[in-house]
Regions:
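SAM-dependent methyltransferases
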Residues: 115-177
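Solvent-exposed alpha-helices and their adjacent loops that cap or buttress functional pockets
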Residues: 32-35, 61, 119
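Alpha-helical scaffold segments in soluble metabolic enzymes
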Residues: 5, 78, 82, 137
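Structured adenosyl-cofactor binding patch, chiefly the S-adenosyl-L-methionine
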Residues: 53-100
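Internal, active-site/partner-interface "lid" segment
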Residues: 74, 86-126
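S-adenosyl-L-methionine/SAH cofactor-binding core of RNA-modifying enzymes
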Residues: 1-45, 51, 88
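Fold-independent oxyanion-binding glycine-rich loops
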Residues: 18-21, 43-46, 65, 72, ...
């Protein structure tokens, strides 16, 4: 009844059931979900929900990972947060979402704050120099380095530019020396 009522109050809603059996949720899926202006997230508890409801009311099944939790509430919160932050005006800086991990198929570059030097080390000089093209190159290289080390599977899926290929060669040389 709740699904039908929600559908009535918002025409053309897209119903997503959160279950480990669904297609895996990722940044690309968050961007796709944003295209649906009205979404109903359906979360089960313990054993899930009645199959007849899934067959008659659900448009797609979505999983947040290869694990099981007690209910779908926390996965629903993850989906809500990932989708909402892509909505124009939600983040203070409109460029923030486009620089996040996974937005371009890579992990995000390292972040540094003030002061320039503290007990944990120094901020890289290139970030303090003010040369925006050098900073952009450093960010790309460090993003590639981090992805290469921590999530090499992402690089296999990405179509690399010539610049990215050259930077990965540099990274491999640096790692081997």
């Amino acid at each position: 009844k709740a699904i039908k009522k929600a559908k009535q109050s918002s025409n053309s809603s897209h119903v997503i059931y959160l279950s480990p059996q669904g297609q895996k949720f990722n940044q690309k899926r968050a961007e796709e979900f944003l295209q649906h202006r009205k979404i109903i997230l359906l979360s089960g508890r313990y054993e899930g929900i009645d199959e007849r409801v899934i067959e008659s009311e659900v448009d797609e099944i979505c999983s947040v990972g290869d694990f099981v939790v007690s209910g779908g509430e926390i996965p629903a919160l993850l989906v809500i947060d990932a989708v909402c932050r892509l909505e124009k005006g939600v983040l203070g800086d409109p460029d923030s979402a486009s620089q996040d991990s996974f937005s371009d198929g890579l992990l995000e570059f390292p972040q540094y704050t003030r002061p320039d030097s503290n007990e944990f080390g120094e901020v890289p000089d290139v970030l303090l120099g003010g040369n925006h093209s050098e900073i952009a190159k450093w960010r790309l290289k460090e993003s590639l380095r981090r992805t290469f080390k921590l999530r090499p599977d992402l690089l296999k899926k990405k179509v690399l530019t010539n610049q990215e290929k050259a930077l990965i060669s540099e990274i491999k040389s640096e790692e081997n020396s």
